[in-house]
Amino acid sequence: MTTDNISEFLKKASNYGLQEFLDIMGELSQESTKKGLLSRQQKELITLGLALFKNCHRCISIHSHEATRLKATDLQLGHVKKVLFFMNATPHGESDLWEDWVLSWKEYSYSKVNERRQFREMVAIAISIVKQHEKQIELHLNEALAVGVSIEEIFEIVPLVMLMDGAPTLSQIPVLLSCYEKYTDNRENS
């Protein structure tokens, strides 16, 4: 799927009703297991982060087992848990603590190993979408793109989120697209 096709698909999906949504879920289930830019292991670890955030014990068990089967290391599993810790500590609303939280996140997320930072941002984007937290979505989308995650890789995260969270994810697709448009506009103007 090309970026334009994915973008069009996501725009349409945000306006669908229940039957269309169920049809999409069937397609997404198949799509999420296909080979793409993200490895199967990355997808499992991101999905594990979502399962932990949602506190779904059955999902945690399934995705922990699958990530381990795909040779995820204890270090990688630890990164998922640390991202979850940070995401759960996010200030709510218009808190004065937001800027301090962002600085703490950036200190944690920074790594000399670029792939670690990319991975942390991808897990954070997925959780931000489930949280329906616009500031988080914008922050993690911008950070991910800045460290080399492609928009296509980010679009591969959306089906995982939809499979774990269902219909509420649809309300965040316009937010994700708006943040991406803002990011590209800012890059073009700088």
Regions picked out by a protein language model, each given a short descriptive name:
Residues 44-54, 120-135, 158-164:
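Short N-proximal segments of mature Sec-exported proteins
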Residues 147-151:
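Long amphipathic alpha-helical coiled-coil segments
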Residues 1-44, 48, 55, 64-118, ...:
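Acidic, glycine/proline-rich low-complexity segments that act as flexible tails and inter-domain linkers
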Residues 77-80, 153-157:
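Membrane-interface alpha-helices at helix entry/exit sites of multi-pass transporters
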Residues 57-59:
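Conserved redox-active cysteine motifs that mediate thiol-disulfide chemistry
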